[in-house]
Amino acid sequence: MRLLDTATPSVSSIPIAPHATQPTETAMTITAQEALTRCIEHREIFHDEMLHLMRQIMQAQISPVMAAAILTGLRVKKETIGEISAAAQVMREFANKVEVTDRENFVDIVGTGGDGSHTFNISTASMFVAAAAGAKIAKHGNRGVSSKSGSADVLEALGVNIMLTPEQVGQCIAQTGIGFMFAPTHHPAMKNVAPIRKEMGVRTIFNILGPLTNPADAPNILMGVFHPDLVGIQVRVMQRLGAKHALVVYGKDGMDEVSLGAATLVGELKDGEVREYEIHPEDFGLSMISNRGLKVADAVESKAMLLEALGNVPGTPREIVSLNAGTALYAANVADSIEDGIRRAREAIASGAAREKLDHFVRATQQFK
């Protein structure tokens, strides 16, 4: 593990500003026109103003033309950590919540997507392994947009009923240690934004809000991101949102996972402090292996590769799932370190417990049909 020097920001093309300017005074409200002007002038929209603005956008109180202009303006001027935090707070307000009483070792495993790697659903496979090893998982996901197979697609292929109410998701977590929250069901207000995003056809702030807005409010998270600059940004957003233990990762081969094919950048929030470092497969006794063999064409192929990994079939799928599930176990505070987590993940796979966890979860979701 190599600690990174984060004092000097790197120059990047990603449309996000890493540091927010703190206001001396903030207005409670801001008009759409004022917000757009602020973006054009490359000035920050402060926290309370962003709360007001996002509530208007989510409730369709701003015209589609103006909403699109503001979303574009935010991207061009570069969104700040404060703006992202406020926007995520509003999305959480509008979400259909999942109540979970036992929150010990409770974690979300999620990625932003958009990395263009077209690999099988590594984080989805990892959640079964992590749950079998003692974590409780609240996974928040959707159908594939940039990927060949989103988490919802592969879960359906595996026989999971993804159309559960928040109450039913909570019951699944209590019964199996796993809950899957299908984004359209839990974020109904997004229907007002979806047509705007579709017509725009470019990345906006909403592309990075999904992983920040878990309806079960999991206090711990393993989050993969599509760009290296997002590592430091998202972990600091999680800090503002009150996360307990967060690991934000970016594989330097472009994966929004902990990678076997390259070093992985990590931003970790623990005990209220953030640190950034780099890890390598060799740190954990793993060989560096190209991720090319992990690519799939659709959910059917992703399902097959996921079952290989859970079935303890030797190969790259099993290795990368062990690596990511182990990291999730560390994020969930089940394991004392990533290395300890990998050991626990391997045991869960080799014993058959991970595959049994998948079968149990499928049965639990089917009871609600």
From Swiss-Prot:
Its cofactor is Mg(2+). It holds the Pfam family Glycos_transf_3. InterPro entries: Anthranilate_Pribosyl_Tfrase, Glycosyl_Trfase_fam3, Glycosyl_Trfase_fam3_N_dom, Glycosyl_Trfase_fam3_N_dom_sf, Nuc_phospho_transferase. The keyword Kinase does not apply. Binds 2 magnesium ions per monomer. Its EC number is 2.4.2.18. Anthranilate 1 binds at G111, N142. GO terms for cellular component: cytosol. Keywords: Amino-acid biosynthesis, Aromatic amino acid biosynthesis, Glycosyltransferase, Magnesium, Metal-binding, Transferase, Tryptophan biosynthesis. Anthranilate 2 binds at R197. GO terms for molecular function: anthranilate phosphoribosyltransferase activity; magnesium ion binding. One of its GO terms (biological process) is L-tryptophan biosynthetic process. 5-phospho-alpha-D-ribose 1-diphosphate binds at residues 111, 114-115, 119, 121-124, 139-147, 151. Mg(2+) 2 binds at D256, E257. It catalyses: N-(5-phospho-beta-D-ribosyl)anthranilate + diphosphate = 5-phospho-alpha-D-ribose 1-diphosphate + anthranilate. Mg(2+) 1 binds at S123, E257. Pathway: Amino-acid biosynthesis; L-tryptophan biosynthesis; L-tryptophan from chorismate: step 2/5. Catalyzes the transfer of the phosphoribosyl group of 5-phosphorylribose-1-pyrophosphate (PRPP) to anthranilate to yield N-(5'-phosphoribosyl)-anthranilate (PRA). Belongs to the anthranilate phosphoribosyltransferase family. Homodimer. This is Anthranilate phosphoribosyltransferase. The lineage of its organism: Bacteria, Pseudomonadati, Pseudomonadota, Betaproteobacteria, Burkholderiales.
